[in-house]
């Protein structure tokens, strides 16, 4: 364990639009690993000043490039296939969780789907038929089997057909939605 603080506050480290598989996956992975290292360092700094007992790692959609956007034309720029994109997504999310779980007594991983994560678009489907949710669900299964993580990490998913999620983080309601849902945010929020 690097450093674990106890307290009432929640630190939030959000991730979205990684789009593994888009053009240069090795560079995207490296940026994410660097961001994880930076988050650990920043959290240690914050914990020296504030009583942070919980960490939230919101996953805000588009973890993979997928094959549905632009009527499938995005596949022409893939450097890895969809199954490998989800594999990368699982491995990076697990790395993030393992790094941050050493720093707090509780880690919450709320997840919402994005548009690139859609499994398909040619039939009407449930909104939660999403590669982003599948990546997180697979990592949740791994965490349940891990002695260190099983009681420390909690995943939160939207209800069937919901694209949004709200979670209570230390008394603050934290709402999440992927940005593809609105072209006019002011109108969308009202």
Language-model segments: residues:
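His/acidic metal-ligating clusters that form di-metal
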Residues: 98-110, 119-123, 129-190
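Short acidic, Gly/Ser-rich segments with clustered Asp/Glu that frequently serve as metal-coordination loops
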Residues: 18-25
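Core catalytic region of metal-dependent phosphoesterases/phosphodiesterases
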Residues: 6-11, 15, 29-142
